[in-house]
């Protein structure tokens, strides 16, 4: 099924992106699913919701990483997601196009 196919993709190092047509906030759940159920690494799951999606859409010059000249769209979570990917659901800071919308620091 789907899990076995995705695990094959992970083993062959094919670049994947994670997206959703659902309302905001659910993209973290998709990354967590990829990490926990599909046995992907935390790094690949995070790249799947950031730079990989941008590259696969041809938008890496505008979004996908924190780089000078790109849109300042940043989401930060308290804690180390490498140790606990569930922390992606605990958003502490949000910046969109350089404007801060949430700051719990």
Q: Which sequence ranges carry the predicted segments?
A:
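His/Asp/Glu-enriched, well-ordered alpha-helical/loop segment
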Residues: 1-80
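Short, small/polar residue-rich loop motifs at catalytic or cofactor-binding pockets
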Residues: 87-89
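Short aromatic-centered micro-motifs
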Residues: 94
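Small/polar (Gly/Ser/Thr/Ala-rich) solvent-exposed segments
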Residues: 83
């Amino acid at each position: 099924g789907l899990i076995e196919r995705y695990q094959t993709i992970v083993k062959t190092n094919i670049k994947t992106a994670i997206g959703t047509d659902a309302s905001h906030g659910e993209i973290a759940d998709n990354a967590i699913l990829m990490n926990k159920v599909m046995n992907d690494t935390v790094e690949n799951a995070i790249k799947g919701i950031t730079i990989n999606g941008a590259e696969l859409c041809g938008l890496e010059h505008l979004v996908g990483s924190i780089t000078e000249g790109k849109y300042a769209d940043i989401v930060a979570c308290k804690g180390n997601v490498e140790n606990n990917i569930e922390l992606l659901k605990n958003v502490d800071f949000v910046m969109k196009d350089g404007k801060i919308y949430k700051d719990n620091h």
